[in-house]
Amino acid sequence: MANDDTTTRSPVRQPFLLYAAKGRIYARNRTQKVIDLGAITREDGGSFRYLLDGNQQSDGGFFTEEEALQAIARSVRFLWLDGQFTAVADARDDANLDLDGATRISIELDEMPPGERAVDATV
């Protein structure tokens, strides 16, 4: 009889792309939906700062937009980002959206393992 121990299964990883374009942070999921996550601005000293709309998370002092995106990638959780894709309108409907040539990074986030509680303290 096979052992059906679900606690040893690896979590499923979901791919996303994060973009910095025209002063905004965008995310794209595997279904190609694009959402606007918040602002990215250049401070007086030349460094970049971001502010996410959904949870007011912010940070600054980044030399490049890519560094800011990497910081977001390190702190964002799957449940929060997945919830944003449910709650926020598809930015592809905005005629002004242009991600060609935008700074971007690829990330993968772990979904919840089976049996784990669906609570995200970062929301």
Map each language-model feature to its residues.
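Mixed-charge, Lys/Arg-enriched low-complexity segments
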Residues: 3-8, 52-123
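Active-site beta-strand termini and strand-to-loop segments that position acidic
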Residues: 28-30
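A detector for short, charged/polar N-terminal pre-domain segments
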Residues: 7-17
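Short aromatic-glycine-(Arg/Gly/Cys) micro-motifs in beta-strand/loop hairpins
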Residues: 32-57
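Short, exposed beta-strand/loop patches in secreted or surface proteins that constitute
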Residues: 15-19, 40-41
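Short, hydrophobic/aromatic-rich segments at coil-to-beta transitions
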Residues: 19-26
